[in-house]
Amino acid sequence: MPQQSLKIIENSQKKLPCNIEAEQAVIGSILVSNDIYDEVSLLLDTNKFFDPIHVKIYETIEKLISKGLLANPITLKNHFENNEGLKELGGQEYLIKITKFSTSTKQAIDYANIVQEMHIRRELIKISESVLYEASSNTEAETSGDEIIQKAEKSLFDLAERGHFNQSFMK
């Protein structure tokens, strides 16, 4: 049984849970109708996205909308002209492409929930890896089993409350 647990952790390293299409649909929907951002932002912030380019796009959308400005492929163009990651995906054409994934507000919220769910699963994997690291590297009893459990409980509680855990567990 312990070998099976280690294999699960090894496999988690290979492919973290994500849904790139859901991320594209959320961002594309906001780029078509900025009003959707008001609903989606209740569920998501930049750290919920998996794809680093989507993180940057969503971050820029947040900045523009918070200033009362329009966020669409044209207004985002200047923010990403020199971004190598976006260039690899096709540059401004990528921003236009993901608007084709745009949906209704209801569907965008459903997709935002999927993005949130994938984020929670990635965070659970991080917590599991932290517990494994703490338990296996502190064999000299620097940290007691009870302390490791308390840290894990706090991390899980933080995740349940806010959708992310305090990275200090890993320190």
Label the predicted regions.
Residues N72, G91, S144, M170-K171:
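Helix N-terminus capping/helix-initiation residues
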Residues D51-P52, E81, Q92-F165:
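Extended, charged alpha-helical coiled-coil/arm scaffolds that mediate oligomerization and mechanical coupling
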Residues G28, F165-K171:
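The Walker A/P-loop phosphate-binding site
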